[in-house]
Amino acid sequence: RSSAASDVYKRQVSTQYDMKDIELVGLQKFDFLGLKTLTIMKNALKLINQNRQTLKLDPINLDDLPLDDSKTYQLLQKGLTTAVFQLESRGIKEYIVKLKPNNFEDIITLIALYRPGPLEMNMVETYIERKHGREEFSYGDESVEKILDKTHGVIVYQEQVMQLAQEFSGFTLGEADILRRAMGKKIASEMEEQKEPFITGAIEKGKNKRFAEGLFDQIEKFAGYGFNRSH
């Protein structure tokens, strides 16, 4: 190490405690992820625009690229996704071919569901079968349909649960956020505390108790693997 690097290293503070204990004593935990993909995209764009300049063409701006390009979806539907960020593993390629995505929402949903929890519960297969009309299902309630329509009745994002809590059970935005935090912590006891107010609130809005219990069971299972949409 250089002397400057050594000085920085000496000033670093470490702890032997895990993340949960650190949060309990009031310290903030951040996760920082480095993505080489962003550098690859930057370099690729630079080379493309250098070539376009030679051909006297306008430079490409990533912000201007359409999200509904039919030729791009044709490549995706064939599983030609080698070197495409988050879509390049053998397993997800198989699901892309089955899904045959034709809109950006499909891609986001597949990436969100392609994780151990949803895979173990066959959520990807359920989404694919419902998208192509091969599996019959019922939303059971207009408010549920309004929120889960784009994902064919499958709970995919924490924001959907917050909306369900508000629309179906009458939660305030603050109460819905408490439910979101309980999901984020993935602590079963905290989720259990949310069950009674969710069902009681639904009954007060004239919803069927058994249906409300079934919906909360789905939310509880989702809490074991769910993330927010931006993640």
Model-derived features: where do they sit?
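Extracellular interaction modules
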Residues: 1-5
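Mg2+-dependent phosphoryl-transfer active-site scaffold
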Residues: 6-226
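Active-site pocket-lining segments that scaffold enzyme catalytic pockets across diverse folds
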Residues: 231
